[in-house]
Amino acid sequence: MEANHQRNDLGLVALTMLAQYHNISLNPEEIKHKFDLDGKGLSLTSWLLAAKSLALKAKHIKKEISRLHLVNLPALVWQDNGKHFLLVKVDTDNNRYLTYNLEQDAPQILSQDEFEACYQGQLILVTSRASVVGQLAKFDFTWFIPAVIKYRKIFLETLIVSIFLQIFALITPLFFQVVMDKVLVHRGFSTLNIITVALAIVIIFEIVLSGLRTYVFSHSTSRIDVELGAKLFRHLLSLPISYFENRRVGDTVARVRELDQIRNFLTGQALTSVLDLLFSFIFFAVMWYYSPKLTLVILGSLPCYILWSIFISPILRRRLDDKFARSADNQAFLVESVTAINMIKAMAVAPQMTDTWDKQLASYVSSSFRVTVLATIGQQGVQLIQKTVMVINLWLGAHLVISGDLSIGQLIAFNMLSGQVIAPVIRLAQLWQDFQQVGISVTRLGDVLNSPTEQYQGKLSLPEIKGDISFKNIRFRYKPDAPTILNNVNLEIRQGEVIGIVGRSGSGKSTLTKLLQRFYIPENGQVLIDGHDLALADPNWLRRQIGVVLQDNVLLNRSIRENIALSDPGMPMERVIYAAKLAGAHDFISELREGYNTIVGEQGAGLSGGQRQRIAIARALVNNPKILIFDEATSALDYESEHIIMQNMQKICQGRTVILIAHRLSTVKNADRIIVMEKGEIVEQGKHHELLQNSNGLYSYLHQLQLN
């Protein structure tokens, strides 16, 4: 009845779903009590206020249909008649719209005409604010401004050194002018010696200061690089599990590797070229003093460089985007192939995999070649402008010298000064590919750094967990347009109780434990531990007090001891050995040559499947968690290993709440209570013998299948 009542207020339903999309839990009844004061449903103003109270940033806008592909989705399409719906995706190629019908509780694909018929032009855009956990500010080029301010003293020193370098660059042409116009004409050898010594001193200072500037600048940018790299990794590990499940491993690795492009840009010559370019106005003033006509030629060339860059840049950026996509595909395929090498060899599909790799590699090389060709065309265009300006200046300068308006020394000095102006422009133009590449890299890296971290609405870090668990009216799906996984699940688990959960594949058993670990926030309802809502709890605090053993566990390339004591490297050896004995792992570990110091290899490749599983069980037990989850933990074990675990099960379960998920019913038959799930709902519960008495029940049916 409560769900039906909520379904009548589509605004509240939409708010619940959008909050869940951003990993924020809410109590619909509490929102209704606070903001639906007249009982007629949430108005536009109250909806925005309710979103703000949930740490969501909501904005009401009016947007034409033709521009909907530019907005951040999913968004709420607000209707004056109250029949709101969610806009999930816009397919501009086929003029189709993926929406979510809140009344029918199902996704819909609408054609252009169908969407125009129901769209009234009003949208509510929803994004998550920075959480209490701490979310990085939006990552783009502006991210580097605070970093530059932080090291402003060092950058100020670099600026001062640059000023002196420009002064030296200004003095050198004057020396040449004096030599050409004075020394050679008057045969002044003593003056020549003085100028030569002075020029040598200037050159030495210029070399030393230039090297010093490069060193100081590289040192500062390296610090920024370290900060960015550290924040990137911390942020990556703070992202919700859904981020990784929705992306290929290779894609994520490829985005993280974009940090190398930013690093090369920061430590390269591009930024020092920008500093040199800033001093060009001083050179222009001196050049104007020599010859306004020649200076106008130089000034006239600058728009040519800019226009050429404007012409090349969009094409180059598109090709760089394509190159990145091909590279990410290759990275993902390579990671997938290496990870699945046992399957590839077992099925003898290496030729097919090689053929796929060859095609993808050829596509990447072709894309990379197109980038190189376009970059070469861009650089040659810059060279053409430079050579053309040089020819014009030579012709015009010679005319000015012949007419007596300019001396030979002044012409030489002018050309040297113009070289100081044009050189950083040319370097920047030639490095334009790097500018474009680093822009792509910042965007790609922003996909990681701008993704919201796991959020919680309070600072709830409770004392040690006791073990009471409660699922209240849980409704959950992994995506707004995905099917419902859990539907109106209610379950109470008492402290110290051993619960078995069984059911067909896809019935929602593992999803229930993922909600308990707060990997996801339910769309509706609450998950409570000791009466406290997990939506308000710090995920790290929670997970440190829950032990989890999965069917496929990952071991790190470290020693057995380090893997068991992963959460506390300084843990006493006695605790490690005790946990290993409980898990039935101590005997086989003792037989190894290095014992607990044996390196297990990448993902535990040096051990058998049963040995890996027992070490994973020991790792889950070593912290003495009050809640223990076995998700098909014994299904990969041989019967002897499983027998050892089951013998110790009474000790393992003592003093803690245990949830056993299994397809093999023999694993759960001694549980205090067995929960039977089907299509996201609890259909039966009771002890083993009680469930068998219901011959028409699902548990009895599964039991009969296993007996046969």
UniProtKB/Swiss-Prot annotation:
ATP binds at residues 503-510. InterPro entries: AAA+_ATPase, ABC1_TM_dom, ABC1_TM_sf, ABC_transporter-like_ATP-bd, ABC_transporter-like_CS, ATPase_T1SS_HlyB, P-loop_NTPase, Peptidase_C39. Gene3D superfamilies: ABC transporter type 1, transmembrane domain, Cysteine proteinases, P-loop containing nucleotide triphosphate hydrolases. It is an enzyme of class 7 (translocase). It is found in: Cell inner membrane. Keywords: ATP-binding, Cell inner membrane, Cell membrane, Membrane, Nucleotide-binding, Translocase, Transmembrane, Transmembrane helix, Transport. One of its GO terms (cellular component) is type I protein secretion system complex. SUPFAM superfamilies: ABC transporter transmembrane region, P-loop containing nucleoside triphosphate hydrolases. The chain crosses the membrane at residues 159-179, 192-212, 270-290, 296-316, 389-409. Residues 469-704 form the ABC transporter domain. It catalyses: ATP + H2O + proteinSide 1 = ADP + phosphate + proteinSide 2. GO terms for molecular function: ABC-type transporter activity; ATP binding; ATP hydrolysis activity; ATPase-coupled lipid transmembrane transporter activity. Its EC number is 7.4.2.5. One of its GO terms (biological process) is proteolysis. Residues 1-126 form the Peptidase C39 domain. It is a multi-pass membrane protein. Belongs to the ABC transporter superfamily. Protein-1 exporter (TC 3.A.1.109) family. In LktB the peptidase C39 domain, the ATP-binding domain (NBD) and the transmembrane domain (TMD) are fused. Part of the ABC transporter complex LktBD involved in leukotoxin export. Transmembrane domains (TMD) form a pore in the inner membrane and the ATP-binding domain (NBD) is responsible for energy generation. Homodimer. This is Leukotoxin translocation ATP-binding protein LktB. It comes from Mannheimia haemolytica (Pasteurella haemolytica). The lineage of its organism: Bacteria, Pseudomonadati, Pseudomonadota, Gammaproteobacteria, Pasteurellales.
